[in-house]
């Protein structure tokens, strides 16, 4: 065992584990007080459901051997059977399993932000269980497994721009459209605790650094690069959103700045192990700009109730990051970009369109697979029960109605 690399992955695993409760705090601060606890429950219940799914068969589907198609693994590692020894970096294989579990958790948790305030908890649990199995595990295998279909074609996704963010953002949007908009008026959709959301977002940011740097698999130059460019991209994303609000609305907001922070982090996620510092400046800025205008179009023009903007931030941001990888990927940062069977450096580095075309192809696969399977899962569930709570429950608030608790009680 390599003690340094193993300790590094343990630290990164803890940081990524922090992301799920941090996201619950971030989300719950942005809803009305009557739905605070329900939002936390929706987000954190994935810890129980998806963690167990991952141990039983999720990891095996994601990283197990397949039958040659490169689409999904088999049951060889059912209940983590056969997980022993160390990988090439001297990290215990079981530690890699748990590190990757954290990615599966946060992917499912992101989806819940699109559905706050009206979806039944049981419906959500069933959906996330099947979505994680049929979408997340399949994409993880195709893009990250050594036998994966998209990996063999040359697609690059360092830390989950497609596997985690595009897939969850698209699923959230499909769910929001199928479940329907919240019945409450615009005033009743405002954030009840911006400081609470701020704390959650900052903890999410801290965890994200382990998410991106840890994807290197060991403590090396690529991990350090991922760590640094993630911070820079987040800063650019935050500032870009604030400036846009300042120019357009004359009032920069904290929630807007936090949205820009997340957009910058999402955008750099697939690229952080492949791009140089100057590229992170561009990626963070443009991801934030595209997410800003995408959010405005979806929320105010189309009037789709993607409640906490999962698609606008994670879906659009992930797409921006995937394309940016095809533009800026550099062998100077990561020699794997020009390794055997790789497609070479990004367009702005090499002048070749090969990697960019493959990145766009992989993005389309992520969008179509997640949209189609999410629609089918929700459609099947709707044949047996309503997807959303009754209107009187929604008006009263889901905290009291579904959980018998209140987030805040005055003495």
Q: Predicted segment positions?
A:
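Glycine- and aromatic-enriched membrane alpha-helices
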Residues: 1-411
């Amino acid at each position: 065992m390599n003690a340094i690399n193993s300790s590094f992955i343990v630290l990164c695993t803890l940081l990524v584990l922090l992301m799920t409760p941090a996201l619950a705090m971030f989300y719950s601060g942005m809803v009305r007080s009557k739905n605070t606890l329900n939002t936390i429950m929706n987000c954190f219940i994935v810890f129980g459901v998806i963690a167990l799914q991952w141990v039983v068969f999720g990891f095996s589907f994601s990283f197990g051997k397949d039958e040659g198609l490169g689409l999904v693994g088999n049951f060889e590692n059912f209940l983590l059977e056969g997980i022993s020894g160390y990988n090439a970096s001297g990290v215990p294989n079981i530690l890699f399993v748990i590190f990757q579990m954290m990615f599966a958790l946060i992917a499912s948790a992101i989806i819940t932000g699109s559905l706050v305030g009206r979806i039944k908890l049981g419906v959500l649990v069933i959906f996330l269980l099947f979505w994680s199995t049929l979408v997340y595990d399949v994409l993880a295998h195709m893009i990250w497994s050594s036998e994966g279909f998209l990996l063999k074609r040359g697609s690059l996704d360092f830390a989950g721009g497609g596997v985690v963010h595009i897939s969850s953002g698209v699923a959230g949007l499909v769910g929001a459209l199928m479940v329907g908009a919240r019945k409450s008026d615009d005033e009743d959709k405002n954030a009840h605790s911006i400081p609470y959301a701020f704390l959650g977002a900052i903890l999410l940011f801290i965890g994200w650094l382990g998410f991106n740097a840890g994807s290197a698999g060991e403590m090396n130059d690529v991990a350090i690069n991922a760590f640094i460019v993630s911070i820079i991209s987040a800063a650019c994303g935050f500032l870009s959103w604030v400036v846009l609000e300042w120019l357009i609305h004359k009032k920069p907001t904290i929630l807007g700045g936090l949205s820009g922070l997340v957009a910058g982090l999402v955008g750099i996620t697939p690229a952080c192990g492949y791009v140089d510092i100057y590229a992170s400046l561009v990626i963070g800025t443009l991801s934030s700009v595209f997410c800003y205008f995408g959010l405005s179009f979806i929320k105010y023009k189309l009037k789709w109730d993607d409640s906490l903007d999962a698609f606008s931030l994670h879906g659009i941001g992930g797409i921006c990051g995937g394309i940016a990888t095809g533009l800026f990927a550099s062998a100077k940062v990561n020699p794997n970009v020009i390794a055997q069977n790789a497609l070479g450096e990004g367009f702005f580095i090499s002048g070749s369109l090969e990697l960019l075309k493959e990145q766009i192809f992989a993005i389309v696969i992520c969008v179509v697979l997640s949209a189609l399977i999410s629609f089918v899962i929700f459609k099947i569930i709707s044949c047996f029960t309503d997807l959303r709570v009754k209107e009187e429950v929604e008006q009263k608030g889901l905290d009291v109605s579904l959980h018998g608790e209140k987030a805040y009680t005055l003495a």
